Regions:
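Mature extracellular or lumenal effector domains of secreted proteins
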Residues: 2-276
């Protein structure tokens, strides 16, 4: 009888720990009665002390686990929608299901959707669209090796940020190349702000930015490249050819990370930020 009582107490303690964990996981979500659809919406409904990590948001009728970045890029808050290693993202990869990381977001190729991580992860098209279409989502960005960052805010070396209204990453699936205004891009230390640059995508390969071809297209901005024109250097995905000086392709385990998000701007207090 005494043994049963001890087991019962242990069970109650375990349940309390679990419920506490879940409450932290979805705070500002179920607890407030608001069905948040992105990490940015979660931040608006929280106590603003959230740290980077795994949370749950609503995508459609269900809760979806996601990785949130609240700290690296103020005043932006980001939801991770895809991440893959160079080994998986390279166009000739033979790894199982590597095709999932060679498709534009127009197509549904989820991978490890219930376990967000950085080596091989992609949300379903429906979950991506739910985050992308949420009212506060205004931008998408690409980063490199985010899982290896130890200090915030992060450096903006090998980083790209684009406004959704300038390039609809969920809808465009065939552009060879298209010229689009990019808010900010840095490749191997070379930066361009509010530039019109070529972004490539096709039904058979992931959206990518070919820095070595920028001097021939659009505004003809030059990103010095060790490869020159042929073969072109792929950045932030596709990786038909790549440079080990670009952080996303610096090693076989280097990761490329895609995010949807926007600026956190509390209505009660206008904050002045110098946006990159």
């Amino acid at each position: 009888m005494k043994y049963d009582a001890i087991k019962y107490i242990q069970l109650l303690v375990s349940l309390c720990i679990l419920v506490g964990s879940l409450t932290n996981e979805v705070q500002g979500n179920l607890s407030s009665g608001i069905k948040v659809k992105s990490c940015l919406e979660l931040f608006y409904t929280s106590n603003k002390t959230l740290t980077n990590g795994h949370y749950a948001i609503h995508t459609g009728l269900s809760l979806t686990p996601v990785y949130c970045d609240f700290q690296s890029d103020p005043p932006y808050v980001w939801t991770l929608v895809e991440s893959f290693s160079r080994n998986r993202g390279i166009q000739t990869s033979k790894l199982p299901e590597s095709i999932n990381f060679r498709k534009p977001y127009y197509y549904n190729y989820p991978y490890n959707e219930c376990t967000p991580q950085f080596q091989a992860y992609r949300l379903s098209h429906a979950s991506m669209k739910s985050i992308y279409d949420s009212p506060r989502t205004t931008h998408w960005r690409a980063t490199c090796n985010f899982d290896k960052k130890k200090k915030y805010p992060i450096s903006h070396r090998d980083y790209m940020r684009v406004e959704n209204c300038r390039y609809n990453i969920m809808a465009i699936y065939n552009a060879q190349p298209g010229c689009y205004i990019v808010d900010y891009v840095n490749v191997r230390g070379y930066t361009c702000k509010m530039c019109q640059l070529p972004i490539y995508v096709s039904p058979s390969y992931h959206v990518t930015f070919l820095s070595s071809r920028t001097y021939s297209y659009c505004q003809k901005w030059k990103f010095p490249s060790e490869y020159g024109f042929n073969p072109p250097e792929s950045n932030f995905g596709y990786f038909s050819q790549y440079s080990i000086d670009h952080e996303c392709s610096s090693s076989k385990d280097a990761t490329t990370n895609y995010w949807f998000g926007g600026v956190y701007q509390p209505e009660s207090k206008l904050i002045s930020y110098k946006l990159l």
